[in-house]
C-alpha cells in the first residue's frame, strides 16, 4: 500500500528519487537556477564593514585573492556605492591534478550600499591592501544655519 498525499503516491516518488541515475542528479546539481543561487549567495557572502568617522565614511570589504584591477568601484543612481568584481581560479591545468575540496568561492560578486545625503561623491578614494578594499567617502560640511531674515515694518 502506498501512502498518498493528495493524488501523489509519496513512497513511489521517494523511491524513484532514490533510484535516479547519478547523471540525472549531476544535471540538476549544475542547472542554471542553482548557479544563480550560488552567485546570489556569493554576493551576499562578501563581508563588509561600514565605519562612520567624524569626517568620512569608510567601507572595508574583504577581497582575499583578488587583484586590484579585478575590482570595480562605482556610484550609481547618485547615491549607491557599488563594489563588484570577479574571483578567478588559476587556469593552470596540470595533468593528473584534481581538486579534492573547493571551498573558496569563485565567480562574480557585487555589493551595493546606500549612501547618506552628506556623502561627498566628488572626493571618493579606494585602495586595496592585504585583501581588504577600503573605500573612503568624505562627508560634506554641514550646511550653514540660515540667518533669520529681518523684515522692515513700515509705519503708516
UniProtKB/Swiss-Prot annotation:
Keyword annotations from UniProtKB, A to Z: Cytoplasm, Stress response
Protein's UniProt name: 17.7 kDa class II heat shock protein
Annotated ranges, domain sHSP: 39-156
Organism: Arabidopsis thaliana
Family matches, as CDD domains: ACD_sHsps-like (cd06464)
Subcellular location: Cytoplasm
Keyword Cytoplasm part of the UniProt annotation: yes
Pfam families (UniProt xref): HSP20
Gene transcribed to yield this protein: HSP17.7
GO cellular component, one term: cytosol
Record-linked InterPro entries: A-crystallin/Hsp20_dom, HSP20-like_chaperone, Small_HSP
Keyword Secreted listed: no
Amino acid at each position: 500500500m502506498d501512502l498518498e498525499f493528495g493524488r501523489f503516491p509519496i513512497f513511489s516518488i521517494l523511491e524513484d528519487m532514490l533510484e535516479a541515475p547519478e547523471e540525472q542528479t549531476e544535471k540538476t546539481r549544475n542547472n542554471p537556477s542553482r548557479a544563480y543561487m550560488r552567485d546570489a549567495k556569493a554576493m551576499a557572502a562578501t563581508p563588509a564593514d561600514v565605519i562612520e568617522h567624524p569626517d568620512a565614511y569608510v567601507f572595508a570589504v574583504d577581497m582575499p585573492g583578488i587583484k586590484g584591477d579585478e575590482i570595480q568601484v562605482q556610484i550609481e543612481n547618485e547615491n549607491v556605492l557599488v563594489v563588484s568584481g570577479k574571483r578567478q581560479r588559476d587556469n593552470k591545468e596540470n595533468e593528473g591534478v584534481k581538486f579534492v575540496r573547493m571551498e573558496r568561492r569563485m565567480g562574480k560578486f557585487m555589493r551595493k550600499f546606500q549612501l547618506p545625503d552628506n556623502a561627498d561623491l566628488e572626493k571618493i578614494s579606494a585602495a586595496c591592501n592585504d585583501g581588504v578594499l577600503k573605500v573612503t567617502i568624505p562627508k560634506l560640511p554641514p550646511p550653514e544655519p540660515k540667518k533669520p531674515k529681518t523684515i522692515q515694518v513700515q509705519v503708516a
